[in-house]
C-alpha cells in the first residue's frame, strides 16, 4: 500500500460547459451525453448556483471543434467572473492554438487528455488531425508554462502545470495504446498522471464495451510507475459504476496508486475495517480530501 494514499471526493466541483451541448466531433465514448450534464457558462445564475451548492472549484470544459480544441478562450469574460468570485479553475483545453496560450496562466490547473496512437484520434474522437501535430502542441504548451515560471520566479507557484489524463480502454474497451501515451507523458514537466476508464454509456457507440481486465490494468499502472518515476498516479473520477467500480478500486489500491477519486462505498467500508475505522495506522496514512484531483 502507498504510505500517502488519498481518497478524493469531488463534491465541491462543478462542471461547466463553454459550448452548451455543442460539439463538432461526437466522440464515440461520449456522443454529447456528458456535455448535457454540465452547467452552461452563459447561465446568469451560475455564480448563485456555485454558492448555493457550496462549490469551491469549477471544471471549465465543453465540446470540441473540428481541430480538437475546446474553445474556452471565447468565454474568458465569463471565466474571469467565476475566478473573481474566488473559485479555483481547472480547464480542459484539448488542442490549443498558440495565440491563446497566454490565457493558460489564468487557470489553477490544466487537464489534457493524452492518446497514444493515430487510431484513437480517428476511431474514437472522429478527429482528422495528425497525432504528431497534437503532441507538438502539447509540448509547446508545456514549454510555455515552464518559461512563464522562469520569467516570474516569485509567482512560479501560481503558474499551473499540465495534468495529463489517460482513459484506459477508450477504444471500445480494448487495448488503447496506453503505454505509448505514457511514453509521451514522460517528456512533460508534470507532478502526476490521472488514469480514467471508459464508461460504457447508454446512447453512445461504446455502450456495450467490455470493462478493462485487471491484468491489463496492472500492466498499465506498473508501466507508468517504471516510466514516470517519482510522479504520482491518480485514479480519476471517470470509472464504471457498480460491481466493476468496486473491483477496480481494490485492484488499484493493491497496485499502490497514490489516490482514488470518488471511491466506491464498498471499497471504503472494507478499508475502514482494515484500518479499524482510523485512517492512520502504523507507518501508513490514508487521507481524505475534497476537490478536483488535478488540484490535489
What residues fall within each predicted segment?
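Conserved strand-turn element in the central/C-terminal portion of the radical SAM core barrel
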Residues: 141-176, 195-210, 232-243
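P-loop/Walker A phosphate-binding loop and immediately adjacent motor/lid segment at beta-alpha junctions
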Residues: 123-162, 217-218, 225, 231-232, ...
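Glycine/Thr-rich phosphate-binding loops of Rossmann-like dinucleotide-binding domains
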Residues: 68-69, 120, 172, 203, ...
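N-terminal [4Fe-4S]-dependent radical SAM core
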Residues: 1-39, 295-296
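Conserved Radical SAM active-site core
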Residues: 32-159, 174-187
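Active-site beta-loop-alpha junctions enriched in small/polar residues
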Residues: 33-35, 63-65, 94-96, 115-117, ...
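Auxiliary Fe-S-binding modules of radical SAM enzymes
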Residues: 1-6, 10, 47, 182-296
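Hydrophobic faces of well-ordered beta-strands that scaffold small-molecule active sites
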Residues: 14-16, 58, 89-91, 110-112, ...
Amino acid at each position: 500500500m502507498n504510505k500517502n494514499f488519498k481518497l478524493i471526493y469531488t463534491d465541491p466541483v462543478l462542471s461547466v460547459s463553454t459550448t452548451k451541448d455543442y460539439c463538432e466531433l461526437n466522440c464515440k465514448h461520449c456522443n454529447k451525453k456528458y456535455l448535457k450534464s454540465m452547467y452552461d457558462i452563459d447561465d446568469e445564475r451560475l455564480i448563485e448556483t456555485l454558492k448555493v451548492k457550496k462549490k469551491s472549484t469549477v471544471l471549465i470544459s465543453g465540446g470540441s471543434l473540428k481541430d480538437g480544441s475546446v474553445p474556452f478562450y471565447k468565454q474568458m469574460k465569463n471565466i474571469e467572473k467565476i475566478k473573481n468570485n474566488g473559485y479555483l479553475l481547472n480547464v480542459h483545453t484539448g488542442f490549443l492554438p498558440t495565440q491563446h496560450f497566454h490565457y493558460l496562466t489564468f487557470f489553477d490547473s490544466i487537464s489534457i487528455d493524452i492518446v497514444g496512437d493515430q487510431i484513437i484520434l480517428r476511431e474514437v474522437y472522429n478527429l482528422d488531425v495528425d497525432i504528431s501535430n497534437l503532441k507538438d502542441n502539447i509540448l509547446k504548451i508545456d514549454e510555455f508554462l515552464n518559461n512563464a515560471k522562469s520569467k516570474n520566479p516569485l509567482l512560479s507557484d501560481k503558474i499551473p502545470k499540465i495534468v495529463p489524463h489517460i482513459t484506459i480502454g477508450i477504444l471500445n474497451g480494448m487495448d488503447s495504446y496506453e503505454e505509448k501515451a505514457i511514453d509521451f507523458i514522460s517528456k512533460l514537466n508534470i507532478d502526476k498522471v490521472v488514469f480514467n476508464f471508459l464508461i460504457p454509456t447508454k446512447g453512445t457507440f461504446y455502450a456495450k464495451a467490455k470493462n478493462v481486465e485487471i491484468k491489463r490494468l496492472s500492466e498499465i499502472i506498473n508501466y507508468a510507475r517504471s516510466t514516470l518515476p517519482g510522479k504520482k498516479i491518480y485514479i480519476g473520477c471517470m470509472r464504471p459504476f457498480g460491481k466493476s467500480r468496486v473491483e477496480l478500486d481494490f485492484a488499484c489500491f493493491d497496485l499502490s496508486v497514490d489516490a482514488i477519486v470518488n471511491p466506491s462505498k464498498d471499497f471504503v467500508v472494507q478499508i475502514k475495517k482494515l484500518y479499524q475505522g482510523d485512517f492512520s495506522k502504523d507507518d501508513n496514512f490514508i487521507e481524505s480530501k475534497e476537490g478536483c484531483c488535478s488540484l490535489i
